[in-house]
Amino acid sequence: MARAFGIVTSSGTHIKVEGLQQYRPIGAFSFLGRYRVIDFPISNMSNSGIDRIQVYVRTKPRSLAEHLGTGRHYNINSKRGKLQLMFAQNSSENDVYNTDIASFYENIEFIERMHEPYVIIAPSYMVYAEDYRELLQTHIDSGADITLLYHSVDNAREKFLNCDILNLNKQKGVESIEKNRGSAQKRNIFMDTYVMSKELFIELIKKARKISSMYTLPQIVNESSADLDIRGVSHRGYFASITDFNSYYNANISLIDIKTAEGLFNPEWPIYTKTNDSCPTQYLEGASVKNSVISNGCLIEGTVENSVIGRGCQIKAGAVIKNSIVLSLSLIHISEPTRL
């Protein structure tokens, strides 16, 4: 039993995935055919023994609520375990006021009721694997007030432009948090993952609300960096931040490569998801599939190359799919020519 409860946050108002986000939150996006993006943070928590998890959602919660259900498929449905969907009403027409702090403050009584002394906060829009037991123990052993998880990259001028970065000293103490503005290639990308005591978390929420109704959690942590002992811990392995359409596409396509996928998937660290009873994919005569991820329940008659195909798709004869992500239950076929 972990000494921490978990919080999975919704994406910030600055994150826009055009073409998808107007229909569902990023956590409910299809990922690699069979998963949803939110499966990764919840699986990390479940595998780490965290069985009391709050999932925050701001808009269009239906698809996320249907996928999460009671949480049984995440292996957290014990007598004490509970997966809670926390609704945060958008209280202002101006999104700048609809922050994560506003969501936490609106549900602060539920946070205060938690019996665990620590909280681990992770985003619903980043994909990675991490043992939070080790992260929590590192936090406790260090004596830090707050521990932040980061991933070092060497392509920050072109990628991760909607993310925060950590400025660290030689002892990996966090000196400040700021936006990645593409001014340098090597950066420590903040993975929006925090470890701290429940009491400090509540204190920061209330402090932020007093300073400004526009404050976010990264901003109040940055504001407090001079007074608190804040440490950074480096993450190893696969990491993707879904903050726009290109990053969503690239995250899916990159995992077609087996070596890349090995940095995320491990038989000893399962990624749980809602299962669907469906037959194996059928490959009919004339089908051609190369370097692709094909989910269950599909019917393939055409050509698929370097693509991710969701569950229950039909690729009809003559159709050619290349370098694409096809969402579940899609039908791809060649249109009949229009006769005048």
Write out the residue ranges for each language-model feature:
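Unchanged
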Residues: M1-N252
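Left-handed beta-helix
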Residues: M1-S10, R209-S335, R339
